[in-house]
Amino acid sequence: MKMLIRISLLLFVVTGFAGCSEEFNGQFPVNKATPSQVTVLPDGVTNFAGGATITYQLPDETDLLYVKAVYQLPDGSMREEKASAFSNSVTLRGFGRSTVAYVKLITVDRSRNESQPVEVEIHTEDSPIYGIFESLDVNEGWGGFTLQWNNPLKENIVVSVMRLNDENVYENIETFYSAATSVYQPVRGLDPIPADFGIFVRDTYQNYTDTLKLNMKPWFEMMLDRNKFIPIPLSSKFTISVYGTSNLTVLWDGIVTNNGPNGIYYINAGAYNPYFAINLGVKAKLSRFRYWSRTDYYFRLHSAKEIQIYGTNDPLVGNNPESDNSEWILLNPEIFVSVRPSGLDPSVPATGEDYDYALDGEEWEFPWEVPAVQWLRFQQLSTWTGTMAMTCNEIRFWGEPQSE
């Protein structure tokens, strides 16, 4: 008998839980009265690129919960946007090319009763992706090619880069996500042989532009062999901080997350803009370089804000730490300027976006016309906080070594 009672109780509990899982989780309707409709104002429709905003007058309903807008996109999919009872407008997005669409505005009360719909006609403008696509500028470059585009409305977009494979099918090789107003984006790691490429832009609503098709031949480049680098002694103008190391080779040890005194090259400069020099071990036409600052002080303290790089093939100049800049060749007539993605003040620690950007290394390209050189002088013109010291974590150079 005890066993029978236990089984009965267990069945009751299981049945009870099963029943609870199917119950409505929320407020049951307290009435079935149909709420009143919204009143769309005479100038209540504001059309914009990719959508529209509808402004209306709310009904006098004490239990109004929200207003929903139901509409169909050109691809046939249905969308629904909701605006709270404290708002008198609803914004609709997701349209591609300019179109006429009809929107149903429906009020919903706390009992989930719905009003009769009010139909509103909107005339959307082209999505921003088409203007972005028209602004797209593509040029052959080192190790691939470069993309530039303008996005004045800061639309969240995706730029996809494809290459025609041996089966005559375009396959994706790069995908870039951005909402920045102006973008310069290299595509790297490609062989220096002619190939067919395709580029298109889409938004987060799956609207696509046409595909720009180009045949391009990337310029050859390779990362210079760091094992060949030879450090040049530091100028007597400067001293090494006790918080850093005098071993210049830490700048090409392959570790980009150094913080301690044994991993950071740290110069106290005084009245002069700090610099150091390297013998690359090979004469090379440089294409670009990448710079990493001290990890725990990204975009702060002694992190470089402005950089200039000089080169020479004269060993008497290159090996002399006291040689004047006038004896060297300036390789970047336009100063390399560090850019902080967040745009925040240096007094504010790096955001997640800042950190990820800096951890990947900040990169600059050399002009095409720079001569091939063997010695480099790296000079910091300013820091993010205006200090006269330099902290550097890692540097890497790419280019084309010259045969003797």
List where the protein language model places each region:
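C-terminal motif of bacterial Sec signal peptides marking the signal peptidase cleavage site
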Residues: 16-19
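Pro/Thr/Ser/Gly-rich low-complexity, intrinsically disordered linker/stalk tracts
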Residues: 21-62, 113-155, 210-235, 398-403
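Solvent-exposed loop/turn segments flanking beta-strands in beta-repeat/beta-sandwich domains
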Residues: 51-53, 58-78, 150-173, 300-305
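Beta-strand-rich modules
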Residues: 65, 90-118, 182-219
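Short beta-strand segments within Ig-like beta-sandwich modules, predominantly Fibronectin type-III
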Residues: 80-86, 172-180, 355-357
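Short S/T/G- and acidic-enriched coil/turn segments that sit immediately N-terminal to beta-strands
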Residues: 86-91, 180-184, 360-364
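Disordered, acidic Ser/Thr/Pro-rich linker "stalks" and the adjacent N-terminal cap
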Residues: 215-283, 294-295, 299, 345-347, ...
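Aromatic, loop-rich ligand-recognition surfaces of beta-strand-rich domains
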Residues: 258-325, 360-404
